[in-house]
Amino acid sequence: MPDEKPTTAAPKKSKSAVFLQRLISTVVLWAIIIAAMFSGNAVSDWCFLGIMLALTWAGLMEFYDMTEKRGLRVFRQWGIFGGLLLIGSTFFYLAMGLGANVGIAPAKAGDFETSIIVIWALGLCLLQIKHFKDKDAFTAICTTFFGLIYVAWLLNFIQKINYFPQIDDSGPYYVLYFILVTKFSDLGGYCAGSLFGRHKACPNISPGKTWEGFTGAVVISMAASVVFVHFLQHKMHGMKIVHAVILGAILGLAAIIGDLIESVFKRGSGVKDSGSYFPGIGGILDLLDSLLFNAPLMYLYLRHILTD
């Protein structure tokens, strides 16, 4: 028999190569999304809706994939339907004027959103009654419901920022602002951790995360926030430099928490990335993890402080 050549493992990419891949993927993806938001023509709203629906669908697919890898039963189709229904109905309520007759105030938009979730949740319970299995009844409902909240409900705050009724045309600028500040937090944390990281922060969850990286993430997000507001303050209703400093710190910290929460899900499911769509990033949830918790924080700050 001929000698078999020993197989060699693929060489591990350097940190600089991974960083470059991550940077290129992030810039290209968010440039497409932002271009759709600022296209300034009749189809821009529909492009925005299409992107939101695509992110919701892919994010829920990945989340339910991870839960099923843990052996948990989930109503996948109903969960995805609920996520798309929530995003689509909120869009028509805010952007297409379905809420105009009652006044599109933030509280009323929240009531509308809650109504959709309640109706969907009742349908989820009926599904469980129809397909009852004693051992997994509780987990099937809870896991399906949590997927809707974690992906679709949190992501829906981006729409509520974009179409916030009390800030004239500032909504897209606030969406752009919180996305850029959050992503600079991610990149700042990665760079600081790679260059200066010595002290592990959460070795059981994400061994690569360090306290130096966390510090860099917050510092860079604050700097990015101040620079953005300095140049575009005239486009952002109610925003001042002091708010930029505070929001930069809040969004930087929340981005870290969002990243760690997704790491908990991935480690619990035994996967490295939630998907493999984007070089250097992974899946949709790897792209969105730090944004999911920052979207509601940005909305709440906008509603209760900047426009109060």
Q: What role is predicted for each listed range?
A:
Residues 2-249:
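Membrane-embedded alpha-helical bundles of polytopic integral membrane proteins
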Residues 265-266, 289-298:
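C-terminal transmembrane helix pair
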Residues 301-308:
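Juxtamembrane boundary at the C-terminal end of a transmembrane helix
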Residues 221-222, 287, 294, 303:
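Hydrophobic transmembrane alpha-helices of multi-pass small-molecule transporters
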Residues 249-257, 284-292:
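Hydrophobic transmembrane alpha-helical segments of multi-pass transport and channel proteins
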Residues 268-290:
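Interfacial loop-to-transmembrane junctions
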Residues 182-194, 254-267:
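Short helical (or helix-break) motifs at transmembrane helix termini and adjacent helical loops
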Residues 23, 63, 187, 260-263, ...:
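Generic detector of well-ordered alpha-helical packing
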